[in-house]
A protein has these predicted regions:
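Non-heme iron-sulfur electron-transfer modules
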Residues: 42, 76, 189-198, 228-256, ...
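Short inter-helical turns and helix N-cap capping residues of alpha-solenoid HEAT/ARM repeat scaffolds
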Residues: 323, 353-354
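C-terminal accessory/binding modules appended to enzymatic or scaffolding proteins
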Residues: 312-338
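Alpha-solenoid HEAT/Armadillo-like helical repeat scaffolds in large eukaryotic proteins
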Residues: 300-305, 312-317, 345-353
Length: 374
């Protein structure tokens, strides 16, 4: 439906409603084919998506919004800030800032190394608190209801739908494509969730943003496994987020030492970005680190049975790995940073009924003993 007549008022109301719901940005793009549809297909053909076969199953839809929602006219793209206020990344030098097109005089002096104590393990920031899908989906339902009252038909997604959401977000001017493939925004850095409302209503599009990465390659240089193989190209099979979340089987032995103390996801390419120096603190406290998780040491996770795991990570993104996946990751982290004090817990894990946990625990024991002997 063409909503151009009188759509300015409706458009303004949508933006106001989105802000009332807590979204930091609400912008509009035409429901056109995504800019990188061909590159996405090539990436799949090279096998760089690893075991994320669901991406290939919906490839046609991802490359054509009309297959997702016939007669779609507009993609309303929303950004929800999840930054909790901790300093991000190692200090960014003035030279790095200039390379990124940022004036050092405008950079706040708030950078610090955010690596957690090695005995605790690291969880990606987006998974510190509650599952963002549940929180944001409720907000999208409110927007959907508003648009229905204006005769629109919608499909609403929080990174789970068949859309190349970063392309639509870039087209709407929410941000620009960083060399890590993450979307960057001058006021939020990279610490925001994307959500989309694909609608049959037509609204004037917003202009895209300029790319402000300049010559900066800090995200590429920061990747522990070399997963960013070139600017704007990521081989998921080497990405720590893929290895610790998406991969269901054993983590390749050659990549295990590079994972360090990370047990769920990885923020290294994000932490390295100079634009995250401008990140604004989110008003949404649901994404703050849970106290009971913050108190855990790596070896404590190995004592979790299925029920304790469910209780600890109820309504958390971490539950996605299930017990077997998280404890697999914990064993790898202990193999990298653990001490002889962790051996009793690992020896118990090596007898776990889940073969995936047992094998990784055995590997970790071997690694610690090698360091102890050395």
């Amino acid at each position: 439906m063409n909503a151009q007549n009188g759509s300015t008022d409706v458009r303004t109301q949508i933006v106001m409603l989105a802000r009332e719901l807590g979204f930091y940005l609400c912008r509009f793009a035409r429901a056109d084919a995504p800019e990188h549809a061909m590159q996405f297909r090539d990436w799949l053909d090279r096998g760089e998506g690893g075991e994320m076969h669901y991406l290939a199953r919906n490839a046609e839809k991802r490359c054509d919004p009309q297959q997702v929602l016939p007669e779609a006219k507009t993609v309303i793209v929303l950004a929800f800030n999840y930054f909790q206020g901790e300093a991000v990344g190692a200090a960014v030098s003035a030279a790095d800032s200039v390379a990124a097109g940022v004036s050092p005089a405008n950079l706040p002096n708030n950078a610090a190394d955010t690596a957690a104590p090695t005995s605790a393990g690291r969880i990606a920031r987006y998974a510190w608190g509650d599952d963002y899908h549940q929180l944001i989906e409720k907000k999208l339902a409110v927007l959907d209801d508003f648009l229905r009252r204006h005769s629109g038909t919608q499909k609403c997604y929080v990174d789970t739908g068949p859309m190349l959401e970063r392309d639509h977000a870039a087209a709407a001017g929410v941000g620009w494509h960083g060399k890590s493939t993450m979307l960057l925004n001058r006021h939020l850095g990279t610490w925001f969730f994307l959500a989309e409302v694909l609608t049959t209503l037509e609204f004037a599009p917003d202009p895209p943003q300029k790319n402000y990465c300049g010559r900066c390659t800090r995200c590429i240089d920061a990747c522990p496994t070399g997963a960013i193989t070139a600017p704007h190209q990521v081989d998921a099979r080497r990405c720590i987020s893929y290895l610790t979340i998406e991969l269901k089987g054993p983590i390749p032995v050659g990549l295990r030492p590079m994972i360090g103390d990370r047990i769920y996801g990885c923020d290294d390419c994000l932490d390295a970005c100079p634009w995250n120096r401008f990140a604004k603190v989110s008003r949404e406290t649901a994404f703050a680190m849970r106290r009971e998780v913050a108190a855990m040491k790596l070896r404590d996770y190995l004592s979790l049975d299925a029920e304790k795991f469910r209780r600890l990570f109820r309504d958390s993104p971490v539950k996605r790995t299930k017990r077997r996946g998280l404890l697999r990751n914990v064993c790898v982290a202990l193999g990298n940073v653990g001490t002889k004090d962790d051996l009793p817990a690992l020896e118990k894990a090596a007898a776990d009924a889940e073969p995936l946990i047992a094998e990784h625990a055995q590997w970790a024991i071997g690694r610690i003993r090698e360091r102890t002997v050395a």
